[in-house]
Structure formats: structure tokens, C-alpha cells
């Protein structure tokens, strides 16, 4: 007889299944909630559409690519990228015409960096360089015979383990973890493989291979920096520092001198290295070329330069010193902690444990004021020559190795017929110089224009500083054949000569006195020309006699405090807006600022600051927005049905009355999405048929490496190389290339270009910024911006403002003079907006004084919009962590209230909870709601005039769709929920069955 199944069996099985399905269901629900909360980031990562377009018109193309295929586009990108490095690389030294090398030269590539060339910096600006050639390949492509034994030694042999830290694509993190790690010279005696030995006679070790490839040693000296931390300027244990040669590198150069006919050094760095070694006979360097970071194709251009196929025409964008610590800005460069930091409730202002504000308990002082880079080195030099009081011990010749603007060529040029005059009708000066190629090869020449303004008793009495010379114009010739000439003409608006008087006139003034304009090869030659015009010679201590024939004197009879007090861009009055940068604003004593009236007595020193109650009010993140007392603002109309679409607004003025009709349709929730979730996009607004956009990074060309969804068509050389070209036409072409790349990849917004200042050589993000000079930075930025935006891309120029340090950069308080901020740190942004037409801005983490830059109305509204006329929108830097107190959204979103009321429009976040917080907190507040409406206006206006509207007409509609992954997650949750319910049902059923079975088999109570 078959045995029946025991009732109630399976309890253990269904218990296990119930627990398993419950755990899976709980995990799925948590995962789904997290994904839904960060839906925007997920959509970006998966390239998932959130809407579909109805009524799209493919003939409605407002911005069109210049290319019919990706192959054509990428070929043109490559050509321009190579030209960029070819014109930006700077020839520093070329003794005995070492360069160019003879065709077919047998060369050895020394340094591990030869096989690990730095193509970009670290962090969000990291680029895809998968198309970049190796250095060996680039050299072989132009006909050089490269030492294979040495190359194999670095790639597969004993030298492969000596790797630089950090490597590309990583964060700098802790500065103490920074290592150059060059291969010790002793390792070159390592025995080689049999195959390598067979490649040449008498090759037994790596060093013995040099004889067969001894025409030249090409030494690659690389330094990498980037987002997250500044370089350490203190000495390593061996007495060297990160921007000087290490002992291993010194030994390597000595070895090269012994073994090779000539030594060529390539400086693969955007942080100015100390150049004391280049002319030291101990190392025997015959030629040196600065190449910056090379991007995808820059190495091809470098090889072309060495071969003579390209004549270098770049000029330095920074002052290169023998000792970088001579810069006054380094005295107080790194962050200082408030002296009463430990006495306070640090949770109020410091939350690094939660990924928050590492700089909110810190401050920095720019005591050097305007004296950044050559503005310091050349000014103090002139004061020494003129015998100014209190100039101190200062020897220019032993301090500066290569001045700002320096650059050599393979040919020679003669300048003549300098002309300059003032044109009252245009209120500008015209400068012209005839340039003739007097050498034997074709080349391009750069003419730089500088001015000097009078340093008066009024200046000394009222805290106005004047640099000895300032760049005010430049021009570059076409490629001139030997014997060919060209007249270079430079226009200099007289407004360039004005200075900012923050203490008395509180605006820009043009003082009475003599102004000098000169054409020069570099900043030092400019000073010498002016000194010559004043009657000084080498007998007075000049490094060389200047040429007074290349100077022009303009005399301004009366101090003018009116003409330049009105913005030429908007007609608005220009006056002080940045009082919070002055320590007296918070009740402290006046900060000592470096002055040329007393170099020795005002040299910067570390300042100890105790955070007082006034300062704590501004830096305390845990505050609640309580509304505006006495406000009469009315709630705007929202959610109306006016039949408007964004397509109807294409090409209309910002102040067109139809904008109000359109904005009346937008709901509060949609405004909150635009304001609160600006991470790499602008959100869809279905009520007005606005599509979502894709926005991403791009100091070296459009890159999506941060979001990981695509590669770029081309990665260009760094911004230092861009500026070093001194070629605005080329930079506009680079911009057009980037715009075409973005059109093809379906992107509308670019987080860049960046244009902060090289305050010192040690800033982590100098590779993202053009120069130490704001005029050059602004002109190059304006050209690049104009080119990019010609393809319907809106650029976010960044980081606005004072983001000149990486260490403790998140909400560090910055103190300096308004003159320094306006003349040095804002000027590049101003030029990019007023001349380049930049549409958007990315704010900085930094504080101006104690006020976060994004909440500083003087900066974001009065200067950016009032004085400069920006009509687009501004976005915060990354604010994706709720711990970004007073920066990201925190308790009761106080910083969002501050930011919106000051003029910030969108937060670089993808967190759904932030949008919800906005909706919950401010929905009944008319002032905040009106600010959100204006932010929405700016964003919609920008997008309406971008390539995002290609295919859109007045009749085009946007319909929201549920992303596939949301449907999939919901299905998974439902299925797991059903399985949990089913397993519980079966478990209960089995338990009941088992109990019933036990009851049937149990003996009766009276049964014996």
C-alpha cells in the first residue's frame, strides 16, 4: 500500500522561502526608493528618455553641424587639436640650434613619464584619451628611430613599477600621497631580454642601448594635479618639492649628459616647474619645450615640433621662477583654521565626516592683492631700478627664469615702425608694429601690448595699487615665410587703463598723469621699454636696456571718476558690491595688504582669526529662512492654460511680454524640478513643452567621463596651452569644434570653460584655468565661448568666483580687497560675458568673506547681471550631498532661500528629496516663489535659444514617459511582493495543516 503524504509537511521549506522573499522584497523596495530618489542620475547613466516629442519637425534646424559624417568631424577635430598644441607649446631654450632634430635621428625617451604622459588633470575634467598615440608612436610617425630597449624597460621591464601618483582619472586626495617616483639611475644597468640584446651590438643592459640611440635623449618631466587638493609646496624629506626636480630626475639628467649627444627636456606640466636646472651646466640641457597637458592628439604636434614640421609659436601664460616660494601669495595660500575652532560646536560648520563642508571652519587671505604673477615680479623689479624706498633685497635675474609672455622660435623676427595714437571717437588706442621674418624657416610671431599707469600719491594714501605693466592687447601674425612681413595692429580701449578705487570714489577711475603703452615680446621686455622711456639703463640695475622707440606716452590731464563708473554693457552704475571681503565688515582690524609703497613693511604674514559672532552669522549653516519682513510680493500665477509652448519663444527677447504668459503655465512642482535638480541637465517642463537637456563637463573639450555615458570625439590640450597660443582666431575655431562635437552627441550645456586665476603655481586646477593674467584669460575665454555657443551650446563659465584653491575649497572664507577681486579675479569672467556672450555661470564653493558666493547678491545680481548683462542662468557647483551646509540643501533649505534671493538659479543635484524639500518649505512664500519663477525664466530663455530646440516649432509638444527602468523596478517589486504574500499564505496553510494533523493523531484524554 502506497504511503500518503504527511499533512503539514513543508513548514521548514516555506519558512525559508518566506524569509528569503521578504529579504529580497525589502532590498528591492529600498533599492527602488533610492533609484527613484535619484531618478535623474539614473536616467543620465542609462541614457533613458523621460519624454517623447509629438509634432517634431526635422526641417526646423536652428543650429547645424558643419560635417556630414562623424569621420569628417573627428578628422577636423584632430587637425585643430594638433594645431592647438603646435601653436601653444613654448620653446624655452634651444642652444646651438639643437632643435629641430635631423630626419631619422636615433633617439631615446628617458623617464617613466615617457610611457605615461599626462594628458589631463584629475577629477571632473578627466577626459577620454583612448585615441591618443603613445609618445613612441608619435615620434616614429615623423621618422625618428626610437630606442625599443628603453621603451620596453619602462613598459615591461624593471622600470614599469615606478609609477607616478596620483595617476590619470584619480583624485589627488591627500597631498602627502603625491609621488613622482622616477626610476633610479642604478636600474638602467638591469640586464635586458635576449630579444633586446639581439637588436643591437653590445647591448647587455638598458644603459648600453643608449649608444645605438644616442643622437638625443628626450626627457619627459611630468607633473599631475587636479580637483580635490592643491600641490604641496613644502619640501620632501630629500629637500626637493613637487615642482622642483627630484634627486632621481637630477641623476637621470646627469646620465643623459654623459651618454647622449644632446639632451632635450619636455615639461609636461601645467603647474609652473622651478626652472633652476635648465641652465645649470651640471645637467647639460640643450633644449627645452613646455608642452602642458596633451589631450588626445597633442603628442603628434610635439613630435612635429621636434622634427621641424611645425615651428613653435607659443608664449608662457605664467611667470616661471627659479624658486616658486618667492610668490607673495604662497605665504597664506593654504587654508587656516579659526583659532576658536575647537571651542565651538563644530557641527555648526564642519561636517567632513558626512562628506560635507571641509572648508567651513577655514579661511584664507589674499594679502598680495593685485600682485599676482608678473604683476609682482615685474613691479618690484622696476621699483629696484628706480630706487624706490622700502623695496628691500630683490634680485630679478636670480628670481625669474622666464617671464610671462616668453617664447622662442626656430626663426628670427625683426620689429619696426611702432605706431600708437589715441582715437577720441572710439576712446581707444591703436598700436601697430611691422613684423618681418628674418630667419630661414616659416614661423608665426606674437606681439604683446602692455600699459603702465601712474602710481600716484593719491594711490598711496587711499590703498590703490598699480602694477608696473599690465597686458592690454596682443596679436599674432599669419605663418610668415622667410623675408615676408606683416603689420600687426592692436586696439586698446582706454577703459583698460582705469583702476578700481574702492575706498574713495568706489568705482573705476582714470587718474591724471602719464600713461605708457608699449609693444613687447614679454612682460619683462615691456617694463624695460617703459624704463628706457623714463631714461633708465643697465647702469641703474636693469637686466637689459629697453627700447624707448616702442613706447607711447599718453597724458591724462584731469582725474576722471565718471566715465568708467557706468557699465558700457548695461548702463548701470558701477560701485562697491563686495564689502564682505574686507575683514572690517565683520568688525576685525583692517587687514595688511601688500603695497609697492612699502614692499618690506607689508610683506604678507599668516593672520590668526577668531570667528566672532558677526562672522558666525554668515557661516552658520543651521539657520531657518523666516521670510522677508514687510514684504508686499504677491504670489505669481501658476498652472494656467494659455496655450503657449517654448517653441513659440525661440528668438524672442528676454523681456518679451509673451514670457509672462508662458511662465504662468509652469507649475510650482515644475519650477522646483528646474531649481532643485540641475545635475548635468535642465529638467523637462511638460506644461510648456520644454525638453530635458544634457549638460556636461568640458575644460579640455566635451567630456562625459563623470557620468560615464559616452566618450568624446576629441580631447584638446589643456587651457594653459590654449592661452599660450595667443591666437583668438584659433581659439574660436577650437570652440566651434567643441560645439560640433556636442551637437553630434546631443548635448546642449557645457560646464566650462573654467577661468579662475593661477594665483600660485601649486593650485590643483591650474590645468583648467588659462593663466595668471586676467586679460589673456578673458580674451581667450571669450573667443572659445563665442565658438562653442555658435553651435547652440550654452556654456557655464566657472567657477564664479575666487575658486583659486582646492584644499578646503568647500565654503572657505576668503578675504582680500575689492580692487584685487575686480581687476584680477573677476576680469576674465567679465570679458567672457561682455565680449564672448557667455550665457551661463557655474558658481564657486568659496565664500566672499563669510558669504557663500552663490548667496552673494552683490556678485550674482548686481555685478553679473547689473554690470555685465548676463541673461542666462547660474548653477551651483556640485551640491549632491545634503551635508553641504549653506551650499547644498540642508535643514529647511536655508541656503536655497539665500541663493535664490541673491540670484542663483539652479542646484547641481539629482536628489529627489531636495525637490520635495523645496516644495514643502517654500510653496506658500511669495518672495521665494517669485525668485523661482525668475530662475525658471532664465533657464527657459537659455534653452529656447539653444540646440535643444532643433526640431521644435510652436506646435511641438512634450509628453512625459515612464523610463523603462522604473517599470522594471515596479514589476520586480510587485513580483517579489506577490511571492512574499504567496509564501506567507503557504506557510500559514502548512502550519495549520500540521496542527490539524497533530490533533487527529493525538490520543484522547481518557485513552489509556
Regions found by a protein language model. Give the residues of each.
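Terminal connector regions
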Residues: 494-565
